[in-house]
Each structure stands twice: as C-alpha cells, then as structure tokens.
Amino acid sequence: MSALRSLGAAAVLLAVAAAQDASVELVLRDGVAVVAERLRGDATAGFTASVGGKAMVVPAGALLLVRGVATAPPALPSAWLQGGDVLRGAITGGDDAGNRVDVQSPVFGTVAVAVDRLDALAAPTVAEPLRLRLPDGVDEALFVRAKVGFDLLAGALHQFGAPGVRFQPDGVDAPRWFAVDEVAALRLRGAEARADAPGATLWTRVGDRVGVTLVRCADDGVQLQLEGGIAATLRWSDLGALALHGGCAHLSDLTPAAVRESGFDGDVVHPFRRDANALGGPLVAGGRAVGKGLGVHSKSRLAFVAPAGAASFWTRVAFDDSVALLGLEPRVDVRVLVGDKVVFERKDFAFGQSAQDTGLLPVRAGDTVTLEVDHGKGRDLGDRVDWIAPMFLLGRG
C-alpha cells in the first residue's frame, strides 16, 4: 500500500472560486520578491503572474518560493511521518490489521496514512511529539498524561479508528481503545522513509508540512500530487508556503559550521530552530507563512559554508509575527557576513518595520556566510527574528 492514498473522492478538493482567492508573494531566483494577485502555469513550462495588474513572465526554474496566508495550527491531532511530513486532522478510521490510519484533514479531505510511515501520532496539545523518546528495547508505546509529565505504556498497536488508538499495554490480557485526547502521543520505532523524492514542500494554513509534486497553478488553486500519487487541488486561501526544490540549497537543510547564542544576561533564551520560529511554532512574518527559514532569538550567530556550485546567497529578515502578542517594541541589529566582511546590515531594526532584503550576495563554494542578530534597545525582550528562506543559489550548467 502506498504511504498515503485517497478514500473515494474526498482527497481531491474542487474549489469553486472563479478567481484566485488570495494573493501570494513570489520569491524568484534573481533575488526579487513580488506580490502577485494571480499565478498560473507549471514548473515545466513556467508561470505567468499578475503583479499590480500587469502580466509578469516567470520562466521555468525561476520560482523558488510561494508565500500565501499565515499558518495557524488548529486543535487537531497530528500524524508525524518519517522524513518530516506532518498531517493534521481528526482520526476517523483505519483498517482492522492496524496498517492504516485515516486522517480527516481540513484542507485535503480524508487521507489514509500507512502506519509503516508513522513516527508519531500526537494529541492536539502536543506540538513536538518526537521529543518523547522511546526507551531502548521498546518499539511501540503510548505516552499517557500523568499528574506530572507522562506515563509510558509499552505494548502493541492494534488498530486506529474513530474512538482513537486501540492498544495493548504489556502485561495486559487484551487491547483497549485510548481516546486521542487521553494520551499525549503514540510513538513507533522503525518508520519507513518515503519511496519517492518530492519536488516541493508545502505548508498549509493549518500547519501541515507535506512533500508534494506541483502539477499546475490555476485560478481555483494549486494542483498537486501528494505521496503515493494522490491528486489534490489546494485552495489559494489554504496555501501557507510552497518551496520548490532544485537550483538552491536552503540553510535550514544544512548543518551550521558554527553556532553562538546567548541572551542579554548570558543564558540562551531560545535556541535557533529550522523551519520554525524561535519558540518552535510556525514561521510567520508580515502576515504570511515562511515555510523554509530559520527562527532565532538574540543574540544569535549562525555560520554556514557555501556548498559546491554556490554562486550567490539571498535571504530576508523580519520579526516573527508572534511578537505582536507580547505588547513589546523589540529592536535588534542584524547583519550578514561573507567571510569577515559585512555585506548587509540593518541597525536598530524594529518590530513593525517591513522585512529587510539582502539582495543577491555573490559567494563561492567554501565561503562562510554568517547570519547575526544582536541585542538592540530594550535588552533581548521579544527579539524573535526570522531569517526568511536563507539560501545559496547554485550556478547553472
């Protein structure tokens, strides 16, 4: 069985809007970022965007990132697959053998997930279930809420269904149903990697992160293939971000050559996060999801070595939208260095200012690119900063 499959027609969403129902921001290979009211075309033939009422041709290979609406995960269970995919939705069913779990997604309809691909199934209030580690010698376990922390129930998974998870703890004669809200997470060891290599990564407005193949952009939405060849049309108003692979190396996929972090008083406030803000939530800046990026908190210094084929570097920097909830007015100094040379700098960068664009910065393979965020006025209070899609652009040919 493929890792994901549709159940009837539910996984193919047919949007009824006659025109694109949400604008998008396009990040292009030449370092330009524009807001488009409409985007049509495909990754093979290229795209046509409507920007300020004028047509703009986007050649094949030039589109790197599409930013849509803000991501705001609802209070729903989440299925965490090997490789990083996350699908959110109600658990509505499964097969008797326990090989499949049916997830009712708000944006994809009902999708069947192969249990062989599953790392974890988490309750709505658990944001990072992979932090719940299985002890050595335990392959399947429920983490059940206790007065303090969690109790671990090792045992055997039997089935998924609308009641939740049918599980048999060790030492118990028969399995029973555990409601999803009754547990923190189900953890499974030995999940299988995805068989295919998706051409893009999609983030939805509800916080899904899914590897996809982009088929076409049309007025009614983005036509996609999910894992296992499932066809789906995602409404533009459900699109958080879409990162197209190829021609670039995202820093969030690379290992830093050096990391230096400290708070105003010395201790690290929040360590940097990959494809998440400094608190572990979705990257959202300027009212739009970011998708690929780095979430940091001052003081932060992250250094990366340009890979083979690197010809230039690009990023934008902004405060994460979560800062708005704090009622603070944080300020930071931000800079980018290539080697020891400062090539981009914004001092006294304040929350509420628009994202700052570095432009294309020339680099060569082996160069060290360093992203710095330093304390500004107001110590380090609220200094949650997002590096938006920092990437090395690879030379062609």
Predicted segments with their positions:
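Bacterial N-terminal signal peptides that target proteins for export
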Residues: 1-8
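Intrinsic disorder/low-complexity segments enriched in polar/small residues
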Residues: 21-22, 346
